[in-house]
């Protein structure tokens, strides 16, 4: 996989559930944050796009939870992108930084709505 963007983050204690691992919903926050940072690096902003009448929305997600992250783990969120018709397909993989173990592979399809 050829990634075009990556960012490092840390697991915060409030993101973990009773088992001491990251709650599944937080992986979606991590991938969304990565997309926001990527677009910002490209000179784009979701807020500015919205003001111009363009809303990028998630159309589909294919997710796998492979290896759980735990409190204080540092991880790397990597992103690849391809255009497929009217959708943008983001391949987003999360790796534990200490050993590069794949924790969460995901494919997220984004479509843009124009003026509603």
Where are these regions (language model features)?
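Hot-dog-fold acyl-thioester-processing enzymes
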Residues: 1-58, 114-116
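Short aromatic/hydrophobic contact patches that present stacked aromatics
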Residues: 15, 62, 109
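Short, low-complexity, polar/charged sequence segments that are solvent-exposed and flexible
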Residues: 26-30, 47-50, 77, 82, ...
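HotDog/MaoC-like acyl-thioester-processing domains
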Residues: 3, 65, 70-71, 81-116
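Short linear functional motifs in flexible/disordered or boundary regions
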Residues: 39, 43, 75, 91, ...
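Intrinsic-disorder/low-complexity, polar/charged segments enriched in Ser/Thr/Lys/Arg/Asp/Glu/Gln
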Residues: 1-6, 60, 74-76, 87-89
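Helix-adjacent hinge/juxtasegments
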Residues: 52-55, 59, 63-81
């Amino acid at each position: 996989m050829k990634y075009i963007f990556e960012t490092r983050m840390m697991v915060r204690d409030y993101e973990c559930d009773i088992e001491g691992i990251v709650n599944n919903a937080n992986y979606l926050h991590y991938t969304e944050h990565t997309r926001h940072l990527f677009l910002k690096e490209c000179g784009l902003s979701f807020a500015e796009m919205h003001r111009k009448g363009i809303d990028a929305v998630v159309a589909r997600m294919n997710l796998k939870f492979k290896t759980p992250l735990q409190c204080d783990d540092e991880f790397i969120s990597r992103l690849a992108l391809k255009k497929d018709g009217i959708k943008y397909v983001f391949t987003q993989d999360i790796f534990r930084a200490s050993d590069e173990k794949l924790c969460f592979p995901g494919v997220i399809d984004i479509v843009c709505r124009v003026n509603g």
